[in-house]
Amino acid sequence: MGALTGIRVLDFTRVLAGPLCTMLLGDMGADVIKIEDDVRGDDTRQWGPPWLEKNGQQFSAYYLCVNRNKRSVALNLKSRAGQDTARTLAAHSDILVENFKPGGMRAFGLSYEELRQINPRLVYASITGFGQTGAYSDRPGYDFVIQAMSGLMSITGEVDGAPHKVGVAISDVIAGLFAHSAILAALFHAHRTGEGQHLDIALYDTQIAALVNVASNALVSGETPPRYGNAHASIVPYQPFRAADGEFALAVGNDGQFRQLCALIGHPDWSADPRFATNPARVANRAALVDLLDGVFCARPARAWVDEVLRAGI
């Protein structure tokens, strides 16, 4: 039995952010009913290859990654019959999640204002690119565009290179996780008070929130954050290093670990050097320290360094 056993979720979402959110609710034991277009289904059913072959059928790997623990129902929401069925399901659900553009559910007679009349306890979550209100609210919200507009691409990529998107649709993932936690809080509120609520989750807002220390640094300094490639803006050493047979990743999070590292590589004096003794000093003298470490690490295989660093607890 999961924490959400007995909770019913009505899932009107497609693609990634919404389906991830509802899948996690299903993982916790909720009964998730996924409403799909009666002709084409979720868009991602057609996204491939790769395909999983089973019982003579092909299933999109993309679709499968965020749609476990769900029961699918095909409805034509443009028809009276489809809308009536959706309303009946909503009347007996605890949670509804949708990711149409603002106003999309209202066109089907399924807005929060309409459904709360038949189910006052309903937790109704809307996931969009830019929220229910505001100058950009009518824009579609694709992950790639959100990564660009939020500034995430500006800080991703090589130091002297072009901005890059992250290798997965991270803005979608972040929005789905924010929606999941907001729904749990709203569900708790509904169980205490009997009151449902409408949750407004925007990919843009949640991606801005996920910039965390980079956004804080920019607000405090007033400067546009540069790209650091695989290095860290505020911690040194914290990047890949080239060993004799390839690269390995090294993350030294504090001065104590740096002293351990220096002892391990046979240069305990470096940890007493004023240029490197503290993390702010190491950040200020990043290039000099990285050059010294490169000269040490290139002498042995990557696996040997990784084993030694792990044994030292770094």
Language-model segments: which ranges?
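Glycine-rich beta-alpha junction loops
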Residues: 39, 130-131, 203-208, 245, ...
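N-terminal helix-loop segment corresponding to the beta1-alpha1 unit
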Residues: 1-182, 186-192, 198, 227
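Aromatic-enriched alpha-helical interface/lid elements that frame and gate functional surfaces
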Residues: 236-313
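Oxidoreductase and adenylate-handling cofactor-binding alpha/beta cores
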Residues: 176-196, 209-221, 262-269
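Short, well-structured beta-strand/strand-turn elements
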Residues: 32-35, 310-314
